Regions:
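Catalytic cores of nucleic-acid endonucleases
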Residues: 479-535
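Acidic, metal-dependent phosphodiester-chemistry machinery of nucleic-acid enzymes
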Residues: 1-418, 425, 429, 433, ...
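Short phosphate-binding/catalytic loops that engage adenosine nucleotides
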Residues: 436
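Short, well-ordered alpha-helical segments
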Residues: 417, 421, 425, 429, ...
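Active-site beta-strand-loop-beta-strand hairpin of nuclease catalytic cores
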Residues: 466-485
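Active-site metal-binding core of divalent-cation-utilizing nuclease and nuclease-like domains
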Residues: 440-470
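Short, solvent-exposed loop/turn segments at secondary-structure junctions
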Residues: 445-446, 480-481, 537-539
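Nucleic-acid endo/exonuclease domains
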Residues: 421-427, 431, 439-441, 450
Length: 568
């Protein structure tokens, strides 16, 4: 492909501006303030990590909100059990910050922000991975090649203060990802001003990061307080600061954070070799390209580039990207195009989405890692190995949990049959240590009544039933697709309420026909306990929702539940 000279000149100019601004130092300072309560400064060639009494980012964010509330006359108000009013209140502040961000973004060259934001997100993913591996004891700082002195100091501090960092790490990393994804999304949908455009510098980036941090934090607070995690949704604003009046606020989030850390360490990675090929085949049929194309494609870096030339961002014109895809995956051109199109980030057209959690965005950089930029009418794609690897993991996760809309129909049955049954069998392995009277996938029963054989079928299949201490346990297993975000908490609670209602309906039929189960096991039943069991820990456990007598637990805690029952 022959590239016009003016395109090459603008491309060179764009990358020259990019290389003249190093955002990594600004970013890692902001990151350190959240994670370690440390400020990173350079003095006389040395790196100084200074403890800070208050979270600098939090205070700056608070000041942004205070200024907005003061202008709008909302600095001192009280909202009591009015969900609608709380949503209106938060959305008014979110709208103002969004408009401030759009006004700021519009004066910059769009390609400049996209290139810098894209590369920084790639850098962020590398840093996050290093932090997680160090915290889990699978990596030490001295084994990481190519660290500069700032990164080395930060990671060393994390390595030596694991207990301090570990509790809050997932919330901080999640917010960090949300901020940079939000920046890219808002930049793509914000038109440039027709007047003279500027290049984003370090100070500009800090402004954008802090304001998006504030916006993401407000969306999170709104989602939390209006979900059903808390008994009351009373809120007071005093001198611009929010006070939530609910005794569960700190208890639930602290307990959840600690348990999540425990289970994250102890729960093995998911692996379903018997089913993954079936799911991938259906993926290919639905979307027109091989699931493994992206993983094969990333070998281009090893095959084409010497180690010293590897970088966080590669720009490719689409024709060349298609050629690389066909060469490294062995697929045909039309399949390469479908792969590229599927993983290409698109602008968000629904502006109301910017009032929602990043989880709800249809197009997110971490899922759609190919970012197109326009130069003189030509499309150039930004490509990053860390982002591609991250997208592969997300796509795999969504495939296993049947969250890819195009694949849902064909993949529902194999997922239900194999993946869910894997959890059922795990539960049965625990139960058999406490009773011989248990049954998996219970629906059809054959009993003998007065020496006559009788068959009975319940309307719904029960995942596991067991009799322990003359108590019938009705266990429903749910391999929940959980997300550790406020929006994720809301979705988890909505799903849990649905499951609780289903179990409550089933209980009526079970109670009416309890004699069938007693005769089947030849054991008296004096009580019935319904149990909703999730594969991992969940925010639902300690929330004040009406559980209708259903015990909610996890696979991790189930054996303790059984031991308690045995001791009654």
């Amino acid at each position: 492909m022959s590239i016009p000279k003016n395109v090459l000149l603008e491309l060179a100019e764009t990358f020259e501006k990019f290389n003249s601004c190093n955002l990594n130092d600004v970013y890692i300072n902001l990151f350190s303030q959240q994670l370690l309560n440390l400020s990173v400064t350079k003095e006389h060639g040395a790196i100084i990590l200074s403890p800070i009494n208050d979270d600098i980012i939090y205070n700056k964010s608070l000041n942004i909100v205070k200024e907005i509330l003061e202008i709008k006359g909302l600095s001192n108000i009280k909202i009591i059990n009015q969900k609608k009013d709380i949503i209106i209140f938060f959305n008014e502040i979110i709208k103002t910050i969004k408009e401030m961000l759009e006004g700021k973004i519009a004066v910059f060259h769009k390609n400049d922000i996209l290139l810098k934001g894209f590369t920084l997100t790639s850098y962020m993913l590398q840093l996050h991975q290093q932090v997680q591996l160090i915290l889990h004891g699978r990596l030490t700082t001295y084994k990481i090649e190519g660290l500069d002195i700032v990164e080395s100091n930060i990671l060393n501090f994390i390595e030596n203060n694991k207990s301090k960092v570990n509790k809050d790490i997932n919330g901080i990393l999640g917010k960090d990802k949300a901020i940079l994804q939000y920046l890219i999304a808002l930049t793509m949908s914000t038109p440039e001003y027709d007047t003279h455009l500027h290049t984003m510098n370090e100070k500009d980036f800090e402004y954008l990061y802090l304001h998006i941090y504030t916006l993401v934090d407000l969306i999170s607070k709104r989602e939390l307080i209006t979900s059903k995690i808390f008994e009351e949704i009373n809120m007071t604003v005093t001198d611009g600061e929010f006070i939530f009046h609910d005794k569960n606020w700190a208890n639930i989030l602290n307990e959840f954070g600690e348990t999540f850390v425990d289970e994250r360490i102890s729960t093995p990675n998911e692996g379903f070799p018997n089913i993954i090929n079936v799911l991938k085949k259906n993926f290919h049929k639905a979307l027109g390209f091989n699931f493994d194309n992206l993983e094969k494609f990333i070998t281009f870096e090893e095959n084409l580039l010497p180690k010293q030339e590897k970088q966080l961002c590669y720009p490719f014109f689409k024709d060349y990207l298609i050629t690389l895809m066909t060469e490294h995956t062995g697929c045909k051109k039309d399949e390469a195009i479908k792969t590229i199109d599927y993983y290409t980030l698109q602008p968000i057209t629904d502006k109301d989405l910017y009032f929602e959690s990043i989880d709800k965005f249809e197009y997110r950089l971490l899922e759609k890692p190919l970012v197109p930029i326009q130069i003189k009418g030509h499309i150039l794609y930004l490509v990053s190995i860390p982002l591609l690897l991250n997208a592969i993991n997300i796509t795999y996760h969504k495939l296993i949990y049947n969250l890819i809309p195009e694949c849902k129909k064909d993949n529902s049955k194999p997922i239900q049959k194999i993946i869910k049954n894997d959890l059922v069998l795990n539960v049965a392995d625990i139960i058999k240590n406490y009773t011989v009277n248990y049954l998996c996938n219970a629906k059809d029963f054959t009993i003998y009544d007065n020496e006559k054989q009788k068959k009975f079928s319940f309307t719904s299949e029960m995942d596991v039933i067991a009799i322990v201490n003359k108590t019938l346990l009705i266990i429903e297993c749910k391999d929940l697709q959980y997300k550790y975000t406020p929006f994720g908490y809301r979705k988890d609670i909505q799903k849990a309420l649905k499951y609780i209602n289903e179990i409550s309906s089933e209980m009526l039929e079970i109670k009416d026909n309890i004699n069938i189960i007693q005769k089947y096991f030849n054991e008296e039943i004096k009580a019935i306990i319904p149990i909703l069991l999730f594969k991992t820990h969940n925010i639902v456990y300690n929330s004040p929702i009406d559980k209708k007598g259903v015990i909610i637990t996890s696979l991790h805690k189930f054996e303790n539940n059984l031991k308690s029952l045995m001791n009654q």
